[in-house]
């Protein structure tokens, strides 16, 4: 049976923790919600969007209509694909494998930035890897590793001594 001191894996509950951590930095004036993520993550400066196929079935790409903003990343409207379908963007995501568990956040970002967007930033909601990009933004903006930032600014002040990443 579960007790007050039972230790469990919290899995997706890291998403709200990550959101809180990023918003702490916003409250401190470290960034604006409408800042392009490329300001902090330059690898995302020239994102491409799938533009269909030509008469021969070759996939075409075009420049995204605008930069991805931190607001887009916070609300899953950045246009990031995932491995859930067979569009060209999904296939490229699967090949780049940004979410592999052996990658650190910096490598995840480098790989994700090579994947064309599924749609233009802000165009629609699509669930995916955005919380990982939020964690990478936390590292870049705070200058601390993500796990260290969250421990110092969220878990320790709340007395959550047994909560951590591994």
Task: Label each residue range with its predicted role.
Residues 119-120, 163-166:
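Glycine- and aromatic-rich loop/turn segments at beta-sheet edges
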């Amino acid at each position: 049976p579960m007790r007050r001191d039972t230790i469990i894996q919290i899995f997706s509950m890291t998403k709200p923790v990550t959101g809180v951590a990023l918003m702490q930095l916003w409250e401190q004036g470290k960034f604006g919600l409408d800042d392009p993520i490329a300001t902090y993550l330059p690898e995302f400066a020239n994102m491409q969007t799938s533009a269909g196929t030509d008469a021969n079935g070759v996939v075409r790409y075009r420049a995204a209509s605008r930069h991805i903003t931190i607001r887009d990343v916070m609300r899953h409207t950045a246009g990031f694909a995932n491995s859930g379908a067979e569009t060209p963007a999904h296939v490229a995501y699967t090949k780049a494998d940004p979410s592999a568990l052996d990658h650190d956040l910096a490598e995840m970002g480098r790989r994700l930035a090579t994947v064309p967007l599924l749609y233009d930033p802000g165009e629609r909601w699509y669930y995916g890897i955005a919380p990982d990009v939020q964690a990478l933004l936390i590292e870049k903006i705070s200058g601390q590793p993500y796990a260290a930032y969250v421990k110092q600014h969220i878990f320790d002040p709340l007395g959550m001594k047994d909560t951590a990443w591994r």
